[in-house]
């Protein structure tokens, strides 16, 4: 009888562990999908800005010429970065709960860090625009570049904020999975409780 009870317990734990791993794999695939979609959106925005900025810079005058010129330059760099990110992104294998948690925290921290950089871009653009008012050396270029950098920093801040919010909301599913596990210790040993 003891063998049958032990076998039944092992079977239940095995089925539960398999179900949790499948749930974890689905979670990780969704995180990858969210990131790939974000990269595609940013790449599309950048490509459109390169095309439009290049055309508009040739037709504009004054600070507007430099505004469009910087939009094309800025988004050329952004498109290069997103292209590298897309090409180097690899599908992950099966990750443990702890590995998944680490990946989730890292992606959220990345978007928060990027948001900080975006604020610095906006401040840098504001500095260039303000400097254009007091310099005699190409003030139109400083004004146009400053306005462009502020705009692009603002767009990136919006993008990074949205991506952080989406990943953060998705990460709450991982927390729910973790709540199903409870590790306890006593003087007699260590136990793992799996809530079914």
PLM regions: where:
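Long, highly hydrophobic alpha-helical transmembrane signal-anchor segments
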Residues: 45-65
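Alpha-helical membrane-anchoring segments
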Residues: 38-47, 67-70
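Extracellular/lumenal glycan-associated surfaces
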Residues: 122
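Loop-to-helix transition at the N-terminal end of transmembrane alpha-helices
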Residues: 62-78
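Membrane-water interface of transmembrane alpha-helices
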Residues: 80-95
